[in-house]
């Protein structure tokens, strides 16, 4: 096996302090992280930098490594001195799994299960990440793909927080999602520590407010403004839906607040069936009237035998 010069790998001097070592590792980890870098061999460089940091960030391991460093040079064959036994051990820095580390590391600090020996520690699962995702009502009908970007916490091999990276994914949103629903994307959270499994990403669906529709379960409600004479005489109105417009017949003598059901034009459920759209009528008075219009209103008032407050009279 070849000797590894951990100082050269991190590009620091042998006298570098802990801060310089940490800074150098963070720089390399961000550059070569498998979720970020598309460079050939990036994953191997990331593991190599992690191994170097595991040793140099631990005072015990670093002291033992410095003791052995005089016996080898980077890339040259190396063998531990006869009778060598690590006092620090593979897990002294808090790292729970060294199976991804090199034979060189294991020859110094141990950490690989011996033949027929104990079951290896599976390490720690990475941190789960949650984020809210705004979804438009129209997108819930067809299962749209959306690009999401989110922060993923990064940790050193010994579990120390090293900052965040930004990760971007194209995510297909299932049709029929509802507000508050949680969608799990397995393994898209923070990387595992010590060979542990990656955490998961949880998307919390938030239905974006719509300028025309209110949501009631899988049903939608739209307010349909009507002039007083339209409500009295009846009319046809082109009512918007999520996908088109439909002609709705308003019968004569319609009332303010009345709801008309338009079947199958609401939101989709998990079974692929759609709720209903309710058109709620709202009688709207003109903001201004001229003398001729007021004369017509007065004529109507004089001739109509209608008292809207009749129920108040005992």
UniProtKB/Swiss-Prot annotation:
Keyword line: Chaperone, Cytoplasm, DNA-binding
InterPro entries the record matches: DNA-bd_curved-DNA, DnaJ_C, DnaJ_domain, HSP40/DnaJ_pept-bd, J_dom_sf
GO biological process: chaperone cofactor-dependent protein refolding; protein refolding
GO CC field: cytoplasm; nucleoid
SMART domains reported in the protein's UniProt record: DnaJ
Location, primary (coarse class): cytoplasm
Subcellular localization, as worded in the UniProt entry: Cytoplasm, Nucleoid
Start and end residues of each stretch annotated as Disordered: 73-92
HAMAP family documented for this protein: CbpA (MF_01154)
Protein name (record): Curved DNA-binding protein
Source organism (scientific name): Pseudomonas syringae pv. tomato (strain ATCC BAA-871 / DC3000)
Gene it is expressed from: cbpA
């Amino acid at each position: 096996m070849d000797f590894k010069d951990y100082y050269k790998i991190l590009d620091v001097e042998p006298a570098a302090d802990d801060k310089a070592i940490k800074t150098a590792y963070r720089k390399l980890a961000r550059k070569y992280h498998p979720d970020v870098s598309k460079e050939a061999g990036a994953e191997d460089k990331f593991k190599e930098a992690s191994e170097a940091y595991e040793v140099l960030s631990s005072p015990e391991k670093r002291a033992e490594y410095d003791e052995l460093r005089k016996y080898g040079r980077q890339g040259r064959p190396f063998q531990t001195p006869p009778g060598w036994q690590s006092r620090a051990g593979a897990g002294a820095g808090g790292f729970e799994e060294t199976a991804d580390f090199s034979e060189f590391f294991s020859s110094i600090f141990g950490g690989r299960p011996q033949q027929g020996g104990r079951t290896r520690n599976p390490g720690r699962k990475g941190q789960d990440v949650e984020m809210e995702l705004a979804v438009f009502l129209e997108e819930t009908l067809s299962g749209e793909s959306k690009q999401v970007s989110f922060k993923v916490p990064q940790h050193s091999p010994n579990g120390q927080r090293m900052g965040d990276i930004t990760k971007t994914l194209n995510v297909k949103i299932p049709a029929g999602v509802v507000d508050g629903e949680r969608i799990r994307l397995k393994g898209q959270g923070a990387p595992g520590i010590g060979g542990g499994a990656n955490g998961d990403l949880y998307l919390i669906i938030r239905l974006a407010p719509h300028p025309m529709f209110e949501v009631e379960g899988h049903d939608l409600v739209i307010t349909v403004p009507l002039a007083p004479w339209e409500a009295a005489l009846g009319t046809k109105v082109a009512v918007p839906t999520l996908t088109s417009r439909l002609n709705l017949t308003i019968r004569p003598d319609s009332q303010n607040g009345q709801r008309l059901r338009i079947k199958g034009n609401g939101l989709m459920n998990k079974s692929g069936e759609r709720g209903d759209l309710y058109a709620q009528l709202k009688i709207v008075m003109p903001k201004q009237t001229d003398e001729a219009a007021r004369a017509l209103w007065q004529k109507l008032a004089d001739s109509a035998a209608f008292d809207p407050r009749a129920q108040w009279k005992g």
